[in-house]
Amino acid sequence: MRATGRARGARRPLRVVRRPGCPVTRPNRPVHQSIGPTSRLARVDVHPSACAVSIEIAPLAARGRRNTDPAGTPLADSAPLRQPLRSVRAHRFGIRAMTRGRAITRTSNEPSSHAGHASPKPPANHRPGRRPTSTPNRRAPAPPPSATPRETPSGRSSVWCILNRVQTDVNVMKSSRSSKSARAEAAQPEFPRLSLFDAKGKVKTVEAQALRVDFADGRSLMFDLSGSSGDAAVAIVAQHTDPSLRATIALRPEHYDSVTVEAGADENPDFAHDATDDAGEDAPNREPELDLAVQYGDEIGDAQRRSLPKRKVIAEWLEPAIFSDAQFTVRFVGADEGRTLNHSYRHKDYATNVLTFAYGEEPDGVTVADLVLCCPVVEKEAREQGKTLVAHYAHLLVHGALHAQGYDHERGEEDAAEMEALEIDILAKLGFPNPYR
């Protein structure tokens, strides 16, 4: 925002200084304003942690000194810091004096007559309370305090001195301002004053203990202004509304007196661990999942295939019979393939109704098995026992699934009774009658 005027006594914005090896920052940023009554430059000290950072503002250099690094070491190749000059108009003498500390410069075209601190004679066109027309309306550059009077090429004398009467006027102005400063300090609030700027540059000042900046994606930055981190220090904490994400803080230095704070987010390992624990606690109540594949042997023609149970129906029959995640392959074969498999693995030279090839459990707890049903044998048994073909297929599939999970009716009568009772209960849930009656 460009200012068109400035009231007497108002602080002039600090100009940005280009320093070798450092990027040039944008002018008139609030972090570049001088601090304190002596207009010293500020240095930013950063104390980071996991998701928080403490930024402390400290004085860097006094007015008129050479540029220094953050450690306070003077830089040999840098130019003196250009500080804003205090403008004092001495109406009594009709001159405009530019002060840097206590040093002022005379800008009148008249030769200096400061010997004995005598006041110069005002120009002929001077009127009290106005600036003489012969005085250029620009500021003269301020030399170092140790400068001595010298003759300029134009023949004019540019004298650097301290005028008692002008200094008296300055002291009067300072005394009036000091009384206002004393009253302001007496009414100083307990917490820092927060200035908010809108898009048009208008400022609104409030007294606040904390400030939070919320972003659209759930990230936020909390600024602690209570002073608990120390004088002229602000603690900044990054937060995120999503518990699965952990807020982070990234610092990007721009200049010796400014730093950019960026809020980020990454995966929260604690949240992932808690979610895994919750999943483990809920695992017993979770329905087991079935990965089912259906195959047909070479002896099964298209007409017979259409009469066999479909994959969806087979899955509905097997789901109540599995107690953990399972990966089953159901294969319908003819008499020749059924006989070959039974002879190869059980050393029995005939085809049987169902063969179960259990491969045990995988490391992740999934039961893997193949269930082979011989269609001619199943159809023959259904006719002989007076059962429907669908009910008999359902019973044999449940029987083979229990075998795959470790149940065995051939180990003894007790194991056989347990397995039969389980089969009856599962088939009853599916709507089928007791197969052993």
From Swiss-Prot:
Record's keyword terms, sorted: Cytoplasm, Endonuclease, Hydrolase, Metal-binding, Nuclease, Ribosome biogenesis, rRNA processing, Zinc
Binding site for Zn(2+): H399, H403, H409
Compartments in which it is found: Cytoplasm
GO CC annotation, single: cytoplasm
Protein name: Endoribonuclease YbeY
Region (Endoribonuclease YbeY) location: 173-437
Disulfide cross-links: none
Cofactor: Zn(2+)
Keyword Zinc: yes
GO BP term, pick one: rRNA processing
Cofactor note: Binds 1 zinc ion.
Listed InterPro entries: MetalPrtase_cat_dom_sf_prd (IPR023091), YbeY (IPR002036), YbeY_CS (IPR020549)
Enzyme class at the top of the EC tree: hydrolase
Region Unknown: start-end pairs: 1-172
Gene name tied to this protein: ybeY
Residues making up the signal peptide according to the UniProt record: none
Organism classification: Bacteria, Pseudomonadati, Pseudomonadota, Betaproteobacteria, Burkholderiales
Residue ranges of the region described as Disordered: 64-158
First-listed, main subcellular location of the protein, grouped into a coarse class: cytoplasm
Biological source species: Burkholderia thailandensis (strain ATCC 700388 / DSM 13276 / CCUG 48851 / CIP 106301 / E264)
MF terms in GO: metalloendopeptidase activity; RNA endonuclease activity; zinc ion binding
Pfam families: YbeY (PF02130)
Protein family: Belongs to the endoribonuclease YbeY family.
Low complexity composition bias: residue spans: 131-140
Cell inner membrane keyword on record: no
